[in-house]
Amino acid sequence: MKNIVITGGAGFIGSHVVRLFVNKYPEYNIINLDKLTYAGNLANLKDIEGKPNYKFVKMDICDFEAFYALMQKEQIDGIIHLAAESHVDRSIKDPFTFARTNVMGTLSLLQAAKLYWESLPEKYEGKRFYHISTDEVYGALSMTHPEGIEPPFTTKASSSSHHEAYGEDFFYETTKYNPHSPYSASKASSDHFVRAFHDTYGMPTIVTNCSNNYGPYQFPEKLIPLFINNIRHRKPLPVYGKGENVRDWLFVEDHARAIDLIFHEGKVAETYNIGGFNEWKNIDIIKVLINTVDRLLGRKEGEDMNIITFVTDRLGHDARYAIDSTKLQKELGWEPSLQFEEGIEKTVKWYLDNQEWMDNITSGDYEKYYDEMYKDR
């Protein structure tokens, strides 16, 4: 495979995948396809924009005719599909946008790929459609051990000081879908379409479901960059409910490595879970962020705990996500490489060192959105 489209490549996870592929595979032609919505930012890729094997194309994935023409013109061999609306709060306010982009956009890509690849003499040989999804499609897990227990698995990236599970259950590749938000419902639907194109037409597809990502270049509507910025400026930290909800955290560069491995070596028609083996309650993550930001800014560590502000909980807020990546670990040899404390330190330092990037994003419409989300809670 030489001609690869990466959709959503100007976004958070997508930009890390684009950078990895452009730098690692100079013999590939990498096309970054992105609509450049509020979360798409070409500044994320300034360091590679002049590379000879990189091209950016501004396009809406729902534009079937334009994407089909691109498939023909560039003779596309592989698609890594990351483009999606992904913020749960926004999906609650505007589910139609999520259905359009995540469901119809994915269907548009699938149909264009099908028509182009089936027109070739070799048809699907050497082709691949890789769809990146979320663990939220599985629903929620129970919090049977709110104080934490020893988890059944460990990796070199597991936290040195905080290695706990908050229940015996985990999401597996065989877990039944049970989405609870418009966002997760739209992603579940897109997952089903991808699998249906394999089962019906024989398209070589792969689906992966990942846990919460963190790292550089994440749009500050998500917890970690939002709170790093607020702590820096000593603005209130709006914590849903009591902050007891649990998420599994995966450093974005580890996720990009997994995508690379699965794209090249994963089995067609398989599903792989990609997790960080790091369960944390939201309130505990926030305390780690406060301590880290305070220390790196030369403040007394923990002195900004007083800006934690508990607000009305999110509608349908799932209690716990925890993902089991054992299949990926055993079959392809992947596991996260960065210990959580190291990843958080690296992440916080990046945002503090790149305030101009943050300022450019948090001006204008962002302030209006932020007030709508949190001002009256």
Each language-model region and where it sits:
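C-terminal substrate-binding subdomain of Rossmann-fold SDR/epimerase-dehydratase oxidoreductases
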Residues: I4, V17, I30, M59-C62, ...
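The catalytic Tyr-centered alpha-helix of NAD(P)H-dependent dehydrogenases
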Residues: T175, P179-S186, P216, P220, ...
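N-terminal Rossmann-like NAD(P)+-binding domain of SDR-like oxidoreductases, especially those catalyzing
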Residues: M1-N213, F263, N282, K346, ...
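Residue-level signature of the cytosolic catalytic core of signaling kinases
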Residues: N41, G50, P216-P220, N278, ...
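Short, well-ordered secondary-structure micro-motifs
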Residues: A43, S142, Q218, L250, ...
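A glycine/serine/threonine-rich, flexible loop-to-helix segment
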Residues: I48, H145, P220-I228, L289
